[in-house]
Amino acid sequence: MAHKKGLGSSKNGRDSNAQRLGVKAFGGQVVTGGSIIVRQRGTRLKPGQNVGRGSDDTLFALIDGKVKFVDRGRMGRFVAVEPVEAAQ
């Protein structure tokens, strides 16, 4: 006879860390070159003018300017950065 109670094991009790995806700079917001605009899996949003795409599909600004989101129907949704005039 066992003198100690057998301890059960659970197959639960794990959780992965959040990936922190989503839009990091919203429409109309001023960004600097190199700053991340959108973190995404796949190309839900496509790079437009003055926007680059990283190997993990992250969209980032290539120049300083204002973020603009454009829906072009069947072509998809694009993110662009419009340069801000130095006079402002």
UniProtKB/Swiss-Prot annotation:
- Report which residue ranges the record marks as coiled coil: none
- Top-rank taxon: Bacteria
Where would one find the signal peptide in this protein? none
Task: Check the record and name the InterPro entries matching this protein.
Answer: Ribosomal_bL27 (IPR001684), Ribosomal_bL27_CS (IPR018261)
A single MF term (Gene Ontology): structural constituent of ribosome
Transmembrane feature ranges: none
Identify the GO cellular component terms for this protein: cytosolic large ribosomal subunit
Keywords attached to this entry: Ribonucleoprotein, Ribosomal protein
Q: Which GO terms describe its biological process?
A: translation
Q: Which Gene3D superfamilies match?
A: 2.40.50.100
HAMAP family (alphabetical): Ribosomal_bL27
UniProt xrefs under PANTHER family: LARGE RIBOSOMAL SUBUNIT PROTEIN BL27M (PTHR15893:SF0), RIBOSOMAL PROTEIN L27 (PTHR15893)
Family in the record: Belongs to the bacterial ribosomal protein bL27 family.
State what protein this is by name. Answer: Large ribosomal subunit protein bL27
Organism the protein comes from: Acidobacterium capsulatum (strain ATCC 51196 / DSM 11244 / BCRC 80197 / JCM 7670 / NBRC 15755 / NCIMB 13165 / 161)
Taxonomic classification, please?
Bacteria, Pseudomonadati, Acidobacteriota, Terriglobia, Terriglobales
